[in-house]
Amino acid sequence: MLFWHTQPEHYNQHNSGSYLRDVLALPIFKQEEPQLSPENGARLPPLQYVLCAATSPAVKLHEETLTYLNQGQSYEIRLLENRKLGDFQDLNTKYVKSIIRVVFHDRRLQYTEYQQLEGWRWSRPGDRILDIDIPLSVGILDPRASPTQLNAVEFLWDPSKRASAFIQVHCISTEFTPRKHGGEKGVPFRVQIDTFKQNESGDYSEHLHSASCQIKVFKPKGADRKQKTDREKMEKRTAQEKEKYQPSYETTILTECSPWPDVPYQANNTPSPSYNGSPNSFGLREGNSSPNHPVEPLPLGSDHLLPSASIQDAQQWLHRNRFSQFCWLFASFSGADLLKMSRDDLVQVCGPADGIRLFNAIKGRNVRPKMTIYVCQELEQNQLPLPQKQDDSGDNSLCVYHAIFLEELTTLELTEKIASLYSIPPQHIHRVYRQGPAGIHVVVSNEMVQNFQDESCFILSTLKAESNDGYHIILKCGL
């Protein structure tokens, strides 16, 4: 049976499983004790989260605790308020919103989080990384899980009342190891909780508190076996060696941390409990790793990134070129900083596909067209000329060629490119012919366009169409 105090207070772990009201001088908390002790007048964190799962005994002193979880098993997270309501002056709303995430602990995997989660999505269609067990949870309102953000859930709760959320983690740590030959050590995850209160507009976007802990997830019953193995190893150590390790505690206290980078500070529209909002609305960012900043629609463009670009200019350039998911990674990078990054650097940070694409975009590398041809207009007395396309010098005596870049290699594309070059409607060009042997006119088909030699030169000759409202274009071989 779970024991709950009538008044939420600051709880701490004890290796017997009970909760003490005073801060214990545990080795892992020695560095934090002065700032958490209420006697010295320091600020207590407004909230505290306790994961009801035992910590590993094989963790050295002054290292972060590690907790083993079983895949798919429901674990309770107790949501506690540290201060009495009379002292809770910075909480001006009855409800707060918490977002629980399962994220990578390793920095290397954080850089490629989007690619890692997308790969997991494709290998496990229809599954989620994190779920909330609603029937077991107590005191939470409006629980939601985005269909596109598989590793996060959110809900509302009242800090003055008993509240606990039961979570289930469905991915295991070895699913993200680079080599899978058996016996690999799984990568550690983090359970992070970010809590927000309402702002003046009623949105839950004002950050209140964040905390996290380190976990590893095993196949069903694997966490129990691992915990037993660690305990047996510690029992074999000498008393002197045991002093270098933390004792195992039956619960895990999440330690304060910075908010997750993609926290929706301004762009959150989750309704309050009294608001009848859309059931499909969801306050989380629709992507998996990038921040959701309020950005105005930006025009599409292939502009080059300049070394003189400021940090803000670099962020806007990333948005314009479809790299929004990496804006949080490059939040402090100027244009010069990005230009100094090598291809290998960007691949390591963004993953192979996006890293190469970002490198090409930064270096201004354009996609080479499938075919390039050069055209020049021929003027004769008995022809209806197209509007003149003059060169920069304005000298009409020169036969100036213009490049036409073809991608689809079709007659329609060729017609549209010629019409665009001479600023006439495409429907005014009725037919396109190529002058063949003995001056015959051959209809230009898709197959003929596909067999043009790259960088061929043509002189455009025009004939008046029979309907008197357009032209026929004749392609003559140029020099």
From Swiss-Prot:
PROSITE patterns on file: GRH_CP2_DB
Residue ranges annotated for the Grh/CP2 DB domain, each copy included: 43-280
Disulfide bonds: none
Tissue specificity: Highly expressed in placenta, testis, small intestine, kidney and stomach. Low levels of expression in lung, mesenteric lymph nodes, muscle, ovary, and thymus. No expression was detected in brain, heart, liver, and spleen. Expressed in eccrine glands in the palm. Expression is prominent in both kidney collecting ducts intercalated (IC) and principal (PC) cells. Also expressed in the thick limb of Henle and connecting segments of the nephron.
Pfam families: CP2, GRHL1_C, SAM_3
GO cellular component, one term: transcription regulator complex
GO biological process, one term: cytoplasm organization
Alphabetized UniProt keyword annotations: DNA-binding, Nucleus, Transcription, Transcription regulation
Region (Mediate transcriptional repression): 1-52
GO molecular function, one term: RNA polymerase II transcription regulatory region sequence-specific DNA binding
Annotated Polar residues bias: 266-292
Region (SAM2-like domain): 261-365
Disruption-associated phenotype: Approximately half of the mutant mice die before weaning and show growth retardation during early postnatal stages. Mice display defects in the morphology of the submandibular ducts, abnormalities in the maturation of renal tubules and abnormal composition of saliva and urine. Leads to a decrease in the expression of pluripotency genes (Nanog, Oct4, Sox2 and Esrrb), while resulted in up-regulation of some endoderm (Sox17, Gata4 and Gata6), mesoderm (T and Mixl1) and trophectoderm (Cdx2, Eomes, and Elf5) markers.
SUPFAM superfamilies in the cross-refs: SAM/Pointed domain
Subcellular localization(s) per the UniProt record: Nucleus
Skewed-composition ranges (Basic and acidic residues): 221-245
InterPro entries: CP2, SAM/pointed_sf, SAM_3, TF_CP2-like, TFCP2L1_SAM
Region: Disordered, residue numbers: 219-248, 260-301
Domains: entry comment: The Grh/CP2 DB domain is required for direct DNA-binding. The Grh/CP2 DB domain is essential to maintain the undifferentiated state of embryonic stem cells.
Assembly description: Forms homohexamers via its SAM-like domain. Interacts with Mta1; which is indispensable for Tfcp2l1-mediated self-renewal-promoting effect and endoderm-inhibiting action.
Protein role: Transcription factor that facilitates establishment and maintenance of pluripotency in embryonic stem cells (ESCs). With Klf2, acts as the major effector of self-renewal that mediates induction of pluripotency downstream of LIF/Stat3 and Wnt/beta-catenin signaling. Required for normal duct development in the salivary gland and kidney. Coordinates the development of the kidney collecting ducts intercalated (IC) and principal (PC) cells, which regulate acid-base and salt-water homeostasis, respectively.
Similarity comment: family membership: Belongs to the grh/CP2 family. CP2 subfamily.
Protein's name in the database: Transcription factor CP2-like protein 1
Lineage: Eukaryota, Metazoa, Chordata, Craniata, Vertebrata
